[in-house]
Amino acid sequence: MIQRLLEVGVVKFGDFVLSSGLKSPFYIDLRAVLGHPDLFQWVVSQYLSTLSKLEYDVILGVATGGIPYASVLGYLLQRPFGYVRPEAKGHGAGRQIEGAEVAGKRAVVVDDVLTTGKSVLGAISAVGEAGGRVTAVVVFLDREQCGAEAVRRAGAGVYSVYKMRELLEALRPHIGEGQYRSAVEYLSQWRC
């Protein structure tokens, strides 16, 4: 299935600017998985394996990348589910967290990719302000660009299905030595 991530465009190589503003020689678009039910099912099974080792009361997806995964995981695990917006809505109920009640609860935050941790840290802050506590963050991919360290400093455990170097190693036969070395060299600049 790892090779399928490349085939369907989840993993791309080139020159990209990430939502964090960082430049990168590769891009991970886990949203592309949504159009491939077999791949989506496999990704969900990887999340399930990771979540089975954790204790929590509610599952919260980070908008928008974590929402499809967190909703399916909540359904399959029969756990209350919700999602966290980057900021409260300016209309309606004006909520930042929708769905599951978090006050007094242990939450696991689900996102697709972890880079600097900015969006996940925003979710951790929102849950804390609502009276809950994020005990763990689960992502499919940790890009190994200091996000995990930032989340740990905020008091939550970090669990990833893959780390970027692991994914690159698995894809190495399919991407060529040049792209592999370029990506690994790029990652080597991050000292957390």
From Swiss-Prot:
For this protein, the Enzyme Commission number is: 2.4.2.10
* Coiled coil ranges: none
Which reaction is the catalytic activity of this chain? orotidine 5'-phosphate + diphosphate = orotate + 5-phospho-alpha-D-ribose 1-diphosphate
Q: What is this protein called?
A: Orotate phosphoribosyltransferase
Quaternary structure and partners: Homodimer.
InterPro entries documented for this protein: OPRT, Or_phspho_trans_dom, PRibTrfase_dom, PRTase-like
Give the keywords, sorted. Glycosyltransferase, Magnesium, Pyrimidine biosynthesis, Transferase
What cofactor does this protein call for? Mg(2+)
Q: Which GO terms describe its molecular function?
A: magnesium ion binding; orotate phosphoribosyltransferase activity
Pfam families assigned to the protein according to its UniProt record, in alphabetical order: Pribosyltran
Specify the species.
Pyrobaculum arsenaticum (strain DSM 13514 / JCM 11321 / PZ6)
Q: Which family does it belong to?
A: Belongs to the purine/pyrimidine phosphoribosyltransferase family. PyrE subfamily.
Identify the pathway.
Pyrimidine metabolism; UMP biosynthesis via de novo pathway; UMP from orotate: step 1/2
Q: Where does the chain bind orotate?
A: 115, 143
List membrane-spanning regions: none
